[in-house]
Structures are given as C-alpha cells and as structure tokens.
Amino acid sequence: MGKTGPQPGRRLGSGRGWRAGAAFALGVLIAAALVGLTVRFQLDGPARWFWILVVVATALAVLALRATGRRSASRAVLLASIIGALGWWLTIRPLGDRDWAADVAYGVTARIEGQTAILDHVRNFDWRSKQDFTSQWETRRYDISTLSSVDLATSTWDNPAIAHTLVSFGFSDGAYLTFSAEIRRERHESFSEIGGFFKKFELVLIAADEADILRLRTNIRREDVALYRLNLTPAQRRALFMTYLEKANQLAAQPAFYHTITANCTTIIFQMARLVAPGIPMDWRILLSGYLPDYLHDHGVTDAGLPLEELRANARISAKAQQADPAIPYSIAIRAEDPSKR
C-alpha cells in the first residue's frame, strides 16, 4: 500500500484557526489598551491603578479562556466587558464648573444690542513669563458695522506640521479681537495630545486682546507665529464674527469636550467657516494645521498674487514682535512692515 499523502485541507484549516486566534488576541489587546488609556486619563490615585489592574486581568482571562478551548465563555466575558466599558464611556460628560487654570478660567460670552456686540470675559493678561502674569478679564463693546479685516494666525513650536490656529478680527478704530479654541485645563493639568482622544479636556473659546494671546506666543513662549490676511467680503467677515459669538454662547450653555482630531483649534475654525461658505472642501491640511496656509492659498482665501513661500515669509511676525519698541502698540508693531495688514 502506498503512503498516505499530505492533507493540505487540514493544514489550511489549521492555518485559518491560527490566524483567527491571532486576530482575536489582537482585538482583545487593542480593546484593553483603549479602555486602559481611558482609565489613565479619567481616574487618579489608587482608583486608576485598581481599574488598570482590572482591565489587564480581564484581558488575560479572556485570552486564557480562548486558549483552553472555552470560546463561548471567552466571547461572553469579552462582550460583557465591552458593554460595561461603553456604558462607562457614555457617562463621562463635559462640565463647566471645574477648578480651571487661570488663563482658561472663563470662556467668552456675548450679547447683541443693535449693531453693538457686548462681550463678557475678554482676556487681557499682562504676561511677564509663562508662570508670571497679571490676570484681567474685561467686558468690551464692539461696533459690528466697523469690522474691517480678518486675519488667521498660526503658531508652531516643535513640529511645523502642527500649528495652533487663531482668528483675529480688526475694526476700523484700530481695535483687534482674537478668538482661540483651546483645551480647558484644570489647575493641575497639562496638555496631552493623547488625552485629547479620551475626553480628558473640555473645549473653551477664548476671546483676547492680541497683546495678550499673540504676544504670549511670540514673546513669552518664543513660538513661530505667522499672520495671514484673509480675503473675505464684508458680509463674510460679519457672518464669521457672529458665528464665533454663537459658538461661544453655545459652549457656555452646553460644555463640550476637546478632541485632538475632530474638535480642536483648526477644525472648529473650519466648521464655522463652512457655516459661512458651505462649499469649501475638506482637506488633509485641515488636520495637519501647519499646512493650513497652503490650503487657504490654493483656494484664494489669502493673497493668491504671491508665491506661497513668499507669502509664508511675509506672514511671520515673531521676530518683529520681539524686536518692537515697547511704546508701539503690539497690533501695530506686528503689522508694521506689511501695509496690507494695517
């Protein structure tokens, strides 16, 4: 009798089983990592470590049940754990009454009386260093009919592909008001990009004087800041300004979480811009905000008559701000060499 030949079907089935087991294990590890990171950013002290141990023990139990052939039990434990984790995730709500860091203690709110916008909690800090400053929150009045310009500011530090973005509105009397969507840190917190995926921070809309919020970045933090004049019609300028005020009041009434991808300084600008101009397309440069000026240049929102590199070079203001005569108002100093921004 001849020898029994190889049984490829059995080997193939065995291979499929191995791959299915590996995929299951990978899924368990990813789920455990996501839940563990949520615990890491939501809990403090002994509770954090207790629940991290629970997550690890549950993942090991699921894998052990699978490895010993008790697949139904493994799936049941995994499903129950996922349902429990999702249920907890849905209970994590944004709050508006935490012990906030001084620079985000208040979000701006607004009310309209005729052509006048009255803004409460406009920030006007005097920064001497990152930790040494004089706090000042003001109520200001702006004549909406005198809106004369809109500038986009970008601020980069370590990675040129990632920028913080701000929008500054100019008025015919020489006043400027800058809006910035920021994480709302508590006093003991520091920023974490990863934490922004796990409901770690609330979102706040800050309205501030340029001599506060831009000078902090140019002169105190020494970041690379650029200022781009946007080509908007008077109607678009007004609509964008009003959209910011509406967003500010909305956040005051209904707090929201900051999200590293979907609700950050740049995506908030994009969402509001789409309310003004619904046809503007989504683009990868909205997420990699350091390239936002390229996107705006391509769509004619900035000065399309200049090559992009020249536009970028002309827009940089940090050196001008640092070298300016302190007697010259900050907003004039950073625009001094660019008549189009006066």
Can you describe what each PLM-predicted range is?
Residues G13-V62, E246-R342:
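Activation targets extended, charge/polar-rich intrinsically disordered C-terminal tails
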Residues M1-S14:
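Short, Lys/Arg-rich, polar N-terminal cytosolic tail immediately upstream
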Residues P94-E113:
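Alpha-helical transmembrane signal-anchor/signal-peptide segments
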Residues I118-N124:
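Acidic, Ser/Thr-rich low-complexity segments on the non-lumenal side of membrane proteins
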Residues A117, R128-V225:
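Glycine-rich catalytic cores of cysteine/serine-nucleophile enzymes that process amide/ester linkages
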Residues R71-P94:
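Internal/C-terminal transmembrane anchor helices
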Residues F198-L275:
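Soluble catalytic domains of enzymes that build or remodel membrane lipids, polysaccharides, and related
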Residues I52-L78:
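Cytosolic-side transmembrane helix boundary signature
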